């Protein structure tokens, strides 16, 4: 079987360190830093695929060379599934116990999505190409997340939390949670990583607003980026399926995000007229209105990780280079 990894054009592997890799503007975490104030990512992709053998899931659906995937002796996975193959954070799981069915589950967390974008780029594909291919099979989408990175930022997450506490939020999502860590400086509380959750963790839609720069600083000790917020739209089950269908039909991430946000929530200003008591008559919070206006410019981007790309090059050198005349 020919390798499913198709490299765009002829790449000289011996020259890669002086040409291809340095051209990608990676940060110290192996992530391409976007210059746009607003950008969108697929940040979680979970797919159930039935009646397809493991080798075909890896080589034909994912289009990852089988030699790159580590086939495990069954490791613990999630929700009644065990990991049977893995490449960094790209996982293929098999159902166990009550979850039995003939097939597998592809699981890519945020890091897994960044890992997989290396293969998309090397195959000269986009997420739309991948999702379209996946939908040719007997599949379901337990979950897919869209993330909007705001590097302006348009919003202050601590301010959103305060507005929510003060009732200045109109929301169709009933369950609300928030976390706001920080410190006192001269008796004034300063946020150091706020998060706002709208919708339950088990619902078909959950919206999460948080300070991504603080999260990355705490997790990895990276340089603090105070101007990096992330707004996540987490879709499950029927809504996840509908989202994928909409993405493939219109290829418009911005329009989809705007439609979901506008239909579910609106942050408010206190009305100047004290007689106004109905929230639907409250004016929209100006910063929220500006975000909704500019979110229409958002495009789906890719931020492949250098770490996993290096593993791909090592595989190419071992398995492909001997058969090429370079």
Give, region by region, the residue ranges found by the protein language model.
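Structured, helix-rich domain cores that form ligand/interaction pockets
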Residues: 1-308, 315-326
